[in-house]
Amino acid sequence: MAEKEIQYAKSFREQFTLRGVLIGSLGSLIITMSSMYVALKASSLPWPIIFVALVSMFSLKLMGKTNINEINVAHTIMSAGAMVAGGIAFTVPGIWMLKLDTGGDLKFQISLLVIALSGVILGLIFTALFRKFFIETQELPFPMGQAAAETLILGDRGGKKAAILFGAMGFSALWAVVRDWFHKIPAFFTGGVTIPGVTFGIYMSPMLMAIGYIIGPLFLFVWFIGALIGDIGIVWGGTTAGLWTLAAAAGIKSSLGIGVMVGTGFGIIVKGILPKAKTVFGSMFSKSQRGDAIVPLRWAPIVMVVLAFVFTSVLHMGVVSSIITILGVWLTTLMSAQILGQTGINPMEVFGVIVLLACKAATAIGQLEAFFVAAIVAVACGLVGDVMNDFKVGHMVRSDPKAQWFGEAIGGVIGAIVSIIVLFILFNAYGAEAFGDPTVFPAAQAGVVASMVEGIANMPAFLIGLCAGIVFYLLKLPVMTLGLGIYLPFYLSFTAFLGGLLKVIVDLIQKGIHKNKPETEIRKSGVGLIIASGLLGGEAIAGVVIALIMVCLGLGAI
């Protein structure tokens, strides 16, 4: 099977096209609908990037001559709305769980639309500011983005490697369908081991193993150390030694993990952003200074002031909380991009909780308004995290970041509007009591936000984590993944760690086979990354397809 040359765009106009925008917009509408429903129904959200990359590629190829950059921009538009929906679904239903608002009046619906659009606008600003730092300066792996880029490159080029990629993709998709739709494969393998308070075992997910393989051993090793500290040390060790109860251990574990992640966020600002403030933020204050920004941003400070006014007057969040929210989005979008770039995971509702708690500590903000804060932050973090994957693809295929950013704006606005419409369609069909009901819409993440409205479970653990996160980051340790490992369930960290361990073994075998070849040639000769990209993509695609089927069946039953 012969390989073809990749077709690249020769200009901005060949990347940002009318047909690409139309295809991307239609895809964004569909993906946002499915993402909202599945986030509520299954308390999870499959990454759509590889699915939409393939849909964009096949759709544009059917319409005639295209190029890989036009495809990249189209799938950026498509995927942008998905995590906007996730940000809303992972926070807002908590309002109804705590019976804070009936949701039936127009004023509340407009408030939620303002929240979604505000999160998108802030996400766009911080994407434009931070894209170069994470994609080019830090060169984070962004495993989902790498897998999508491999899919586009090999899909466009064809040949033997494309056959390997799509073969792995088909296997992974079939595995996911048999596991999640037909329930013939167990979701977990525990080996009969049970540890009180610890979700021990291996998650039977080719995608998670592939994420571990793509990330590589360094980040995975630190991630797994975090899991050992949180689950084996604090939960199992602490309770076995009689130091605290299981409930207290869970509070210490989550507080410590969040503290480490927040501390790392401050470390990024102190060490990575502030020393380059003129370069990073120059476009916001100088007409002649573009800096690292994708587009000129002299309008951004004015927009932030307007948003603060809207938060105060329309959402009644108060002046101080409004300012904290905007500053909090700055911090948490940095954290979101860092975590996602290192692990492929984006706990957007956690970032919402962090800023929510900061507002509660500084002001007497009400519970309803606290949810508004969490939703704005979660939407912004969801959007920034998601499109950083798309920008990773763009960097690998040499797309114009400006074309992608305009695509992000279109997809994000569509996602904000559609997600609120779908949320209230479901609200009117099922009622407020359906949210939090395990048989209808469990919305587990929103339940977590609702439980955290009262405050941090263990403040000493949070402060220890905060200080540790700052210090370790300044010492150049990849400590963000440590905090994530402490916070997440053990099975997620362990499964990803096995993927990283497999990468070490494969690399050692390849070095033994190709002893006299340089490192770059050894990497090119191997197919491990191609197979991992296929495994990751197949399960992600199956997840989106199952989500679309669930939407059709679920909405058809209304």
Where does each model-flagged region fall?
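Alpha-helical multipass membrane-protein architecture
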Residues: 1-558
